[in-house]
Amino acid sequence: MDKLLERFLQYVSLDTQSKPGVRQVPSTEGQWKLLRLLQAQLEEMGLVKVTLSEKGTVMGTLPANVEGDIPAIGFISHVDTSPDFSGKNVNPQIVENYRGGDIALGIGDEVLSPVMFPVLHQLLGQTLITTDGKTLLGADDKAGIAEIMTALATLQAKNIPHGDIRVAFTPDEEVGKGAKHFDVEAFDARWAYTVDGGGVGELEFENFNAASVTIKIVGNNVHPGTAKGVMVNALSLAARIHAEVPADEAPETTEGYEGFYHLTSIKGSVDRAEMHYIIRDFDRKHFEARKRKMMEIAKKVGKGLHPDCYIELVIEDSYYNMHEQVIAHPHVVDIARQAMVDCDIEPQMKPIRGGTDGAQLSFMGLPCPNLFTGGYNYHGKHEFVTLEGMEKAVQVIVRIAELTATRKGK
């Protein structure tokens, strides 16, 4: 699996951080570099129908090597890394045969500690790939890309029976835009899997319903010495708004199937302020209730303001829970589960406290659960992946292809 590690290190060396609030897709030039590289590599591997769309989606097909009416399936990963933390000049550290304890991240005081991340206790003896403490790693989702590419090479080299295998690499997943421009008809798969999960065994087909909230506040600034009855402090209004949001329903206080409100940024002055929230919930009714709650808060805080001062709230849905779409096609999950069992992996089916391209694609007619990559602690300097986990992901992808080859016409 040396080639697997080589691919991964090549992909993370490219800065593909996406950027929110940008109309163009992909949102950054760096993503194009990786997309063009993947297009060239797929062509070099001999895949057919290799394309790169104007919106930055790479697609290709590994043709079937067996006859019969075998359903075409797909595997999908995204090229962008999170805007939450720098993805520039990623300098991975390779820790072979991890023996426990803290791992120094570069030169300085940053460490990857089992005290903060107890999962490390389960990874003794494995090869860990970490950051140097200055950037994220990019295992989300370049581990998935490397695993798909390696699985394709494995299917070819070992002549393992399979039907048509479609692959796709998308941009801007981290800012919720990649799948919006995905051509499901051109992809032409019966179903697919995103390879964008976490630890070994994760098999996910439930995710958050998600929305973004933008609150713009216009106040009135005058000299503080003569401000009584005249000044309207936009920052004070912002503070009042956040005080109304349930403090016990935040990311840091919730888990499992619990939803939350998350203030992601706030900026401004006395004159103007802007707040950005994200809303998440697995239950659609609770999701809608959370959106109504934000509207009620804005209305309450804005009541009685001078006509020239106001609070403007815009809510935009990002994606929905794929569960209802995927369970209508139980074999899609069953095959992945069986593939894991066949690879001596215990499937861990739990909800995604996040989203994937697969959530949107499932609502576009392409059932698309999520498979593990072997990575942990995404979107920050403590991100890492295990080589053994990546190898397991490759095995599962290959086994899914092999099992699907036995489902003629189904």
Swiss-Prot record:
Zn(2+) 1 binds at residues 78, 140, 196. It catalyses: Release of the N-terminal residue from a tripeptide. Its cofactor is Zn(2+). SUPFAM superfamilies: Bacterial exopeptidase dimerisation domain, Zn-dependent exopeptidases. Pfam families: M20_dimer, Peptidase_M20. One of its GO terms (cellular component) is cytosol. The keyword Glycosyltransferase does not apply. It is an enzyme of class 3 (hydrolase). InterPro entries: ArgE/DapE_CS (IPR001261), Bact_exopeptidase_dim_dom (IPR036264), Peptidase_M20 (IPR002933), Peptidase_M20_dimer (IPR011650), Peptidase_M20B (IPR010161). One of its GO terms (biological process) is proteolysis. Binds 2 Zn(2+) ions per subunit. It is found in: Cytoplasm. It comes from the Bacteria. One of its GO terms (molecular function) is zinc ion binding. CDD domains: M20_peptT. This is Peptidase T. The lineage of its organism: Bacteria, Pseudomonadati, Pseudomonadota, Gammaproteobacteria, Enterobacterales. The gene is pepT.
